């Protein structure tokens, strides 16, 4: 077993160090996305890097706060800033419809709602076993507000902008790259006070698997709204059961069960993409 102090290296960094590191990473991302017309992968990596750096920088700002009342509002900045950034990107590129904000008449493959809803089985079981954690209306309201902004930011970034930026790649590659970046985006949780590296690694791994299913459904159904709704329901059940959706180290049985279920759903997602040319994705004609 390693030295406990070593596992707290990143969470224990001074807030200025976290803030500075985050700004440097975000600045590197800006350099990557400058030539927006050259290389979709570079643009996607740039968006990912900007988001990751911004989250780390804001974690530094939050860590610097004291016990003033406004400190409890600071976590909203953690997701509001990258959410506003990604909304600005969509507006600048006129991509809102292309990334899945489509009218109901353009939705496809409604039967894929079934595998999408299967992702909720584990959190439903967990919530049923633990029950709803007692809390106040104010705290729950703040948690739900944070959650909704966070879901918008994550889904629009990884099932929206990143997938669209990678259109030059095969559909399978687009989904896998997007899912991998989605998983890696959770590494900023290493900077949380008391962060468990094993829990963060587990969250990254499972997020990649979930991201495959979400990406496949997003492209096949030609809508991002349903994916956002299911993602929000997933995280809300974690909040109701545990009081938060932060990464924790799983038990071995829990890890095996979650991995088997999510791996099966990820494989199902990849099977969804094995369609004849012209029927896999409805984005091409929207360009």
What are these regions, as identified by a protein language model?
Residues 1-12:
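Short, strongly hydrophobic alpha-helical membrane anchors
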Residues 2-3, 57-66, 124-133, 187-192, ...:
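Juxtamembrane "helix-exit" motif on the non-cytosolic side of transmembrane helices
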Residues 8, 132-144, 191-206, 252:
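Juxtamembrane helix-entry segments on the extracytoplasmic side of multipass membrane proteins
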Residues 10-21, 37-90, 112, 140-142, ...:
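Alpha-helical transmembrane segments in multi-pass membrane proteins
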Residues 24-29, 230-287:
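C-terminal membrane module of polytopic membrane proteins
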Residues 147, 172-187:
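Small-polar-interrupted transmembrane alpha-helices in polytopic inner-membrane proteins
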Residues 153-179, 219-223:
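Membrane-interface helix/loop boundary segments of multi-pass membrane proteins
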Residues 176, 199-259:
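Functionally important transmembrane alpha-helices
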